[in-house]
Amino acid sequence: MSEQNHPQTEPQLDENQIIALRREKLHNIRQQRNAYPNDFKRDSFAADLHAQYGEIGKEELDPQGIPVKVAGRMMLKRQMGKASFATIQDVSGQIQLYLNNKGVSQEVLDDFNHWDLGDIVGAEGTLFKTNHGELTVRVSDIRLLSKSLRPLPDKHKGLSDQETKYRQRYVDLIANEESRNTFIKRSQIIQSVRNFMVGEHYLEVETPMMHPIPGGATAKPFVTHHNALDIPLYLRIAPELYLKRLVVGGLERVFEINRSFRNEGMSVRHNPEFTMIEFYEAFSDYERMMQMAEDIIRNASRTVNGTANITYNGKEVDLESPFERLTILEAIKKYNPHYTDEQLNDAEWLKKEIVKHGESLPPSPGIGSLQLALFEGCAEGKLWNPTFIIDYPVEVSPLARASDTKQGLTERFELFVVGRELANGYSELNDPEDQAERFKAQVAQKDAGDDEAMHYDADYIRAMEFGLPPTGGCGIGIDRLVMLLTDSQTIRDVILFPQMRPE
């Protein structure tokens, strides 16, 4: 605030003493009036007032006496003799309030002087500019709308404890403008993706979150129990098989933005509950899906950042240029030019090299699986600018259509940006007999100890037997997309309430 050197601070008490003092204040308020009134009607947001009147000079603005009603949380406060200043914060930003005994009664001033930082207030008055040019509301009436019983983090230190930041997101959102902006951007990104899909004539749908058979991805599911039916159910690991059932049913372009759940480890890139978009288009293929993914990401960046050339962790990322396309072997060789074709097709050599790069050997010992594991160890993390890795082995792509021209490979891609996977898609396998055989192979892998291998889904095979048209499909991780476009370094910074160990 321009008129103040230091905001009001709490007395030098510990948190429990401060809470007790504030509870006593609340008790006194209850004796006099409704402590939590709900009849104040705000008519203005801080950001709108700054946008409309912020550039108008004091001489022009003050005589107009423009009336406003604002409300928000009190973040700064200072008494100056018979006058007081305060700054309140709403969802859009902050605005300053000015009170003196000419504008409000002494009783109102006395009440105001007993209020604390963090209290939620509603103020009515007229706009003016201070001598320092700050847009301010000259208050004619102000009311306490909600008493804050707990003190806010120190304004200058902020909420620096990461554990508290994630457990008490409500405090983080109050104290940290950066966090508020991240989650506002998250909403805008999701809306941008949704608008883009609708513009491409896709139909938004909702499919089950609890599945009788887990499927659509290779991952460990969460298991629950339906009491009335007395059956196990699985929180979905992916919506894929239900969405493709809809394509069988004639809904030729469908998408879903929703949660999926995977009972696996947590990291800076992984949360067991996460948001993704999956979309499917009949009479399409993985080439079209790659272009869709590219356009979705580029459009979202332009929407929230005004550009498709962004910075992540201090390094430029080019989302504007056409995304590069490499096969798994091409990517390995790009960053390890000393590897030979002979070595990359030698199972024993691959196993040794995989271990050397700190990766685990895949459950399936095929050449394709080994090449993929080596790629993950020696090339994936180096793919900074967006790169499609294409033509994955059949053995690691149980739902993708086999290539007509490249034996043992599928029409599948994964998109990598800043060294991490962002999207996965393919030309869908639409041969029911081939799909049944691949499901059986997955069951064999599961029996051999691969917990993440897929189950056999007989109803999905039945749906395919009615005829699934040639179809392209793609999934994009929304949380990782938000991380990329907001320059966030951990997934916990873009999920409002990330999974945490119990306190």
From Swiss-Prot:
Which keywords appear in this protein's UniProt record, sorted alphabetically?
A: Aminoacyl-tRNA synthetase, ATP-binding, Cytoplasm, Ligase, Magnesium, Metal-binding, Nucleotide-binding, Protein biosynthesis
* Pfam families in alphabetical order: tRNA-synt_2, tRNA_anti-codon
User: So which cofactors does this thing need?
Assistant: Mg(2+)
The entry's Mg(2+) 2-binding residues are: 421
Localisation: Cytoplasm
Q: Which reaction is the catalytic activity of this chain?
A: tRNA(Lys) + L-lysine + ATP = L-lysyl-tRNA(Lys) + AMP + diphosphate
Q: Which residues hold Mg(2+) 1? A: 414, 421
Q: Which GO terms describe its biological process?
A: lysyl-tRNA aminoacylation
Under InterPro entries, the record lists: Aa-tRNA-synt_II (IPR004364), aa-tRNA-synth_II (IPR006195), aa-tRNA-synth_II/BPL/LPL (IPR045864), Lys-tRNA-ligase_II (IPR002313), Lys-tRNA-ligase_II_N (IPR044136), Lys-tRNA-synth_II_C (IPR018149), NA-bd_OB-fold (IPR012340), NA-bd_OB_tRNA (IPR004365)
Which Gene Ontology terms cover its molecular function? ATP binding; lysine-tRNA ligase activity; magnesium ion binding; tRNA binding
What Enzyme Commission number(s) apply to this enzyme? 6.1.1.6
Which residue pairs form cystines in this protein?
none
Q: HAMAP family in the record, alphabetically?
A: Lys_tRNA_synth_class2
Write out the similarity annotation: Belongs to the class-II aminoacyl-tRNA synthetase family.
Question: What is the protein's name according to its record?
Answer: Lysine--tRNA ligase
Species whose genome carries this gene? Neisseria meningitidis serogroup C / serotype 2a (strain ATCC 700532 / DSM 15464 / FAM18)
